[in-house]
A protein has these predicted regions:
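Mature, Sec-exported extracytoplasmic domains of Gram-positive
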Residues: 9-201
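C-terminal motif of bacterial Sec signal peptides marking the signal peptidase cleavage site
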Residues: 2-5
């Protein structure tokens, strides 16, 4: 990834900004093979090119799609991605947060939460956060994500998953989630009982 003609901006938005390209300059950005929604890297690149969302597109030796953006195209893709993240958070069934660097997604769980409450949101946010990292100039090999599930009544971390390029499907089963949630509920009940007893005269 060549960042000649780019600069890292200090603008403070909701998420880290995309690379600032000088007018007339372009940047090549490599994308993970999982970011094409059922398309091959070649098909995804061709579609972006046909829609004039990039200057050029090709598949590199590793089989990943590389897109060449100019200043306006990069900003447009970045703005679209930020919009998609905000929409996904707004439409989520339960509270969700994405940090400024887009490398940490936090899901807040209460006693009525089911894992499927987050399933659609999760698919969207993981993909979009990786895109923001790409547009911000983070090299392909350094894009990572931490996924946290926090039990809201106590603030305890239930699960912490790490998604890297080598481990792109850090997953959690329904059974694992339900078992841990039950443990959390029992722990909370025990805590309430202890607090109640300690308040007795």
């Amino acid at each position: 990834m060549s960042l000649a003609g780019c600069s890292f901006t200090e603008e403070k938005g909701d998420y880290m900004p995309c690379l600032k390209l000088k007018r007339g300059k372009t940047v090549n950005i490599e994308f993970s093979s999982g970011s094409h929604a059922g398309q091959t890297a070649e098909e995804a690149g061709q579609m972006m090119k046909d829609q004039k969302r990039c200057v050029d597109a090709w598949v590199n030796e590793e089989g990943r799609c590389v897109l060449k953006f100019n200043q306006d195209q990069l900003k447009a893709e970045y703005d679209k991605t930020v919009g998609d993240i905000k929409t996904a958070i707004k439409q989520a069934d339960k509270p969700v947060e994405v940090n400024y660097d887009c490398n940490e997604i936090t899901y807040y769980v209460d006693n009525s939460t089911e894992l499927m409450d987050f399933s659609y949101t999760h698919v969207v946010l993981v993909g979009e956060c990786k895109l923001i990292q790409a547009y911000a100039g983070i090299p392909y090999d350094e894009r990572e994500l931490t996924i946290k599930f926090i039990y809201q009544p106590t603030g305890e971390v239930m699960f912490e998953l790490h998604i890297t390029n080598d481990n792109s499907d850090a997953s959690l089963t329904k059974e694992e989630f339900e078992k841990k949630l039950e443990e959390m509920k029992q722990g909370e009940q025990a805590g309430i009982r202890v607090r109640h007893i300690s308040r007795m005269p």
